[in-house]
């Protein structure tokens, strides 16, 4: 938790930023935006073998209930406005994980006329998970990296 000091009477001293970020890292609620085969690996990560619940990661069906969006798969031009609309409906603070080669940069379909060459052209991306499709372990590693990134951010303006 980043405890700075411990007093004799059982008090813990720390900063508000540390407490808020600790709470945020332990309760990530991702909304799935599964577009292709990467979504199957995302479902695999949420199943019993990897069990994202033990990390405080609980999948939510609504953008208004989630603070992380996992974009998994090929993003086509017709779907790009819907992605942005869903992103705008998420409450602040919000984070985006781009999962797979297609979401990262177009992947196998990079030169197709109807493909967005990376979801970072539509929404700001915090973590990129490589692979085609990436394994459940890679997604889990990406989410742990997102938790580390959240711990390092300042929440209170100085």
Curated annotation (Swiss-Prot):
GO cellular component: plasma membrane; respiratory chain complex I
Cross-referenced Pfam families: Oxidored_q6
Cofactor comment: Binds 1 [4Fe-4S] cluster.
One record GO biological process: electron transport coupled proton transport
GO molecular function list: 4 iron, 4 sulfur cluster binding; iron ion binding; NADH dehydrogenase (ubiquinone) activity; NADH:ubiquinone reductase (non-electrogenic) activity; quinone binding
Chief site of localization: membrane
Membrane-related topology note: Peripheral membrane protein
Compartments, as annotated in UniProt: Cell inner membrane
UniProt keyword Cell membrane, yes or no: yes
Catalytic activity as recorded in UniProt: a quinone + NADH + 5 H(+)(in) = a quinol + NAD(+) + 4 H(+)(out)
InterPro entries named in the record: NADH_UbQ_OxRdtase-like_20kDa (IPR006137), NADH_UQ_OxRdtase_20Kd_su (IPR006138)
Cofactor(s) in the UniProt record: [4Fe-4S] cluster
EC number: 7.1.1.-
Top-rank taxon, per record: Bacteria
Residues bound to [4Fe-4S] cluster: 37-38, 102, 132
Alphabetical keyword list: 4Fe-4S, Cell inner membrane, Cell membrane, Iron, Iron-sulfur, Membrane, Metal-binding, NAD, Quinone, Translocase, Transport, Ubiquinone
Assembly, per entry: NDH-1 is composed of 14 different subunits. Subunits NuoB, C, D, E, F, and G constitute the peripheral sector of the complex.
Family under the similarity heading: Belongs to the complex I 20 kDa subunit family.
Chain's role: NDH-1 shuttles electrons from NADH, via FMN and iron-sulfur (Fe-S) centers, to quinones in the respiratory chain. Couples the redox reaction to proton translocation (for every two electrons transferred, four hydrogen ions are translocated across the cytoplasmic membrane), and thus conserves the redox energy in a proton gradient.
Name of this protein: NADH-quinone oxidoreductase subunit B 2
Gene: nuoB2
